[in-house]
């Protein structure tokens, strides 16, 4: 929330600098995310008085003598501004000065005439009409004649000010206003708070047409309405326009500006209905009817449900309660009468409405954090005061106060000094506790025992709920957290911090992937149906059982992911389009599987390892090798079997990944028709290879050994034998290796090192060359032993798979 330093000074006599106040606010629990110096970009720009102005013949320039006080009384500056004249007071940027945007001004000749600076327009100082009158005039900024030459321009045009951008925590709804922060400033500086004026006079006029009925008191506990007539719309005074502009709101008209001003100053969102557009003048606050429509002030049409609260003129909705007014009742230049609304709406309902409709506004942001009834009353009174202060209307006696019960009083607690100190773990003197609570506007009455006190919280502090713990927090943030001495709990034991076994496992997995040349990616947990369409996922596939987002942040992010593959493929395509011709990426993240739809409980979150490798030189076996090394790092081996039913993978270059015979994932080359549908750069479409894979992490972890097992080093060397086999083209390599190992238990490892095809081998056949590693058990292997093993293996391959030695 943005708060203007000069605005705070209207309520508190601040005797510290903005920087010191920033520190004090932080110490009492308010983080200033940014302290903006409005004049920081301007230096050495002062008030200059043009004492002499002579047109330069043949040009549009004027040669001026400028009095800049202590900076020089006769400085020559040339200008092409048409409105310059002798006696003019205007900003003068001197030699070596800087302007917004990093512009530096230096003395230099202008069309051959010496110019020792520049005379400035309002635009060149970053000003507009809301910040300073005349700032948008074409030409130089004409300053008042009482400005003193040499005065820094920041002091003249109001740029000697600061904006505090303060982070307001969700529990401190009372501080989402200038007044709320001013209360805290007054307390931390131990200064009195000067409340904004809320007095106003009421005429005798009562409008018999008006009535207000609240049909949903659970969603609207308090609704105040006040009729104002004889409205004169026009421009707001400069002080109001300036404060609105610096806090991020544009000036519209005096009446609309009052509602925005009260929201910033008091924290109460206000709304003004144009009474000239209301037909029945019967205001009804009710739940919307199913399918009912409303067009809001920003010309957006919404279809409503009974979960939404609307303000109606009879049957016709004229505002979306707590979010935005309707277009059919907006204040216009010809408005002559209005109804002010100041209300307290149920925060949860406003949050659901704003999120559900995707209509987040300043008003809804305030209501979502909570508005007290005190703020509702104060906001209405302040708005009516401003109507009279600005002279733009007659406050009538027609007013309404619809409440679900008696106005809420401040919460009452019985608290003990000893209990507060016990919570804090330190001893804060009783008189200090009393002083702190009183300057925070708590009513405190001590009982005779000197320990018990009766405390009444301010009406605007709805966050004070649980007595002594909340009061302890209030005390310590004012007393100072630095008074707390760090100590161990009495029963505490010193332990070394560490990661859990699963955290170690995840880190190990990531390190193993990085060792294979993969970079970790972190993608959003959302994508769109189109991303699943692009992978040719069937409409009835389990991956289509997805959770849909009610209020997506983008049309491309409408569902929660059921696979990592679409996200990683999008990242790969983006890299290729950016000129990265090759790369390897992985992600270890959750997918979301609903237990049933519509959701009645939280979905299952399963951790998956997704990976993608792309580039002209990538191939299936390189990726397979990376996976084998990954498995080896966990003390297991991966086996593969042909996969022909993964819709987005090439049926001949895809495999399921097995660990201990359990299928844990799949990988392979992206199917040609899927790749053809990608938005790839034209020069890389033909030769680009993309390999995509995904492993269910939790299924994999279930197959990992519980701990390390150690074996003695082998006493005898292994023996290697190369073998070339002729097999059918369709016979997978993994099947051949599995049959070899089943035939001979002494076969420790098998490596495929060549695949060869030719007419001599035969159509539909391929030659596969393997290196077989035999490990002896209790004696060194001789050639005869190895021959016997090979014969056994060949016999098994011929019988099971019809494979012959080449």
Residue ranges of model-derived segments:
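Extended, well-folded interaction surfaces typified by the phenylalanyl-tRNA synthetase beta subunit core
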Residues: 413-581, 721, 773-775, 785-806
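Phosphate-backbone binding interfaces of nucleic-acid-interacting proteins
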Residues: 1-202, 206, 339, 356-358, ...
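Mobile "lid/hinge" segments at catalytic clefts and subdomain interfaces of large enzymes
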Residues: 114-140, 154, 162, 311-409, ...
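Terminal amphipathic helices with adjacent charged low-complexity linkers/tails
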Residues: 189-214, 391-420
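Glycine/proline-enriched, intrinsically flexible loops and inter-domain linkers
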Residues: 5, 55, 189, 193-292
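Beta-rich nucleic-acid/ligand-interaction surfaces
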Residues: 39-43, 200-204, 262, 454, ...
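A carboxyl-terminal module marker
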Residues: 2, 23, 439-442, 448, ...
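Conserved mixed alpha/beta core segments that line enzyme active sites in large multi-domain catalysts
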Residues: 47-77, 242, 246, 259-328
